[in-house]
Amino acid sequence: WVEGYIVGYVDGNSIKSARLFETSSKKTNILIADDTLNVAVTDCVPVQLSTGSSYIDVRNALNLAGNPDKLRCRVKILGAVTKYMGVAGLKNAREHEFVDD
């Protein structure tokens, strides 16, 4: 499990295309960070939101295109920690829980 605040998304194939504190028309990924204050791209972990049957519930619940109200929400996500978008990230997110502050 990884835990953090949803702080944006990546608009491309590299963390260099990160968009902080913006909603998205994309459903493919989100960025999470330890807090919502003084966030830099280097503080973020990209999370892949896959389309497979094991992952679609997480994608539908967390993507910022369909859920702009989830920006700045705290969440725990279960997936595979691996390189994604050129940095350490999370792929195959298959479970999630929203966390109260």
Please give the residue ranges for each predicted region.
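OB-fold single-stranded nucleic acid-binding module
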Residues: 1-101
